[in-house]
């Protein structure tokens, strides 16, 4: 079996030696720009990042049976095409959520240092999924007031939109 892996997926090469039972699998590591229809003709599995568009132009007339994306989103994947062609796929929701939370907390710290935000101000969190819920926990741990809003979830602590508009800082964690 031939597996094509985007070179930009960190640590993938380090994982392969630990898969000793996979002797009949050949891994080919290509740079993103090298992953084109002709270079994956004989591959059955494809692992990518969000910089590569997964669509008919790439997959047509190949042996691809599975596409795995090492990214939190899947807007680079033509899901209908894959499903219509019985190609399984997956992505990695939440894989970068901790990094995003750290970034937001660091940004708030920067704003505090510049006296643009203080600990008595309130942060509004729009979207209460993987990232929004982790951000709320982190803000609570450091004692920063916050209000969450997510119109798709009916949880008690998710306030109405009018209340969140009063926050000094808004952090959006919603699909684009």
Tell what function each PLM region has.
Residues 119-140:
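Glycine-rich adenosine-cofactor-binding loop
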Residues 44-116:
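Phosphate/diphosphate ligand-binding glycine-rich loop within oxidoreductases
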Residues 7, 50, 71, 172-174:
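Glycine-rich, N-terminal phosphate-binding loop of Rossmann-like dinucleotide-binding domains
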């Amino acid at each position: 079996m031939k597996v094509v892996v985007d070179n930009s997926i960190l640590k993938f090469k380090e994982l392969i030696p630990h898969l000793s039972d996979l002797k009949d699998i050949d891994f080919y590591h290509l740079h993103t720009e090298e992953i084109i229809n002709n270079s994956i003709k004989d591959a059955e599995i494809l692992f990518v990042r969000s910089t590569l568009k997964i669509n008919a132009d790439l997959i047509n007339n190949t042996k691809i049976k599975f596409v795995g994306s090492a990214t939190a989103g899947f807007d680079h994947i033509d899901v209908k095409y894959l499903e219509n062609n019985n190609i399984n796929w997956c992505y990695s929701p939440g894989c970068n959520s901790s990094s995003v939370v750290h970034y937001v907390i660091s940004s708030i710290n920067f704003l505090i240092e510049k006296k643009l935000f203080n600990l008595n101000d309130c942060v509004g969190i729009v979207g209460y999924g993987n990232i929004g819920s982790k951000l709320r926990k982190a803000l609570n741990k450091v004692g920063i007031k916050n209000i969450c809003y997510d119109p798709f979830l009916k949880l008690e602590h998710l306030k109405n939109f009018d209340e969140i508009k009063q926050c000094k800082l808004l952090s959006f964690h919603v699909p684009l």
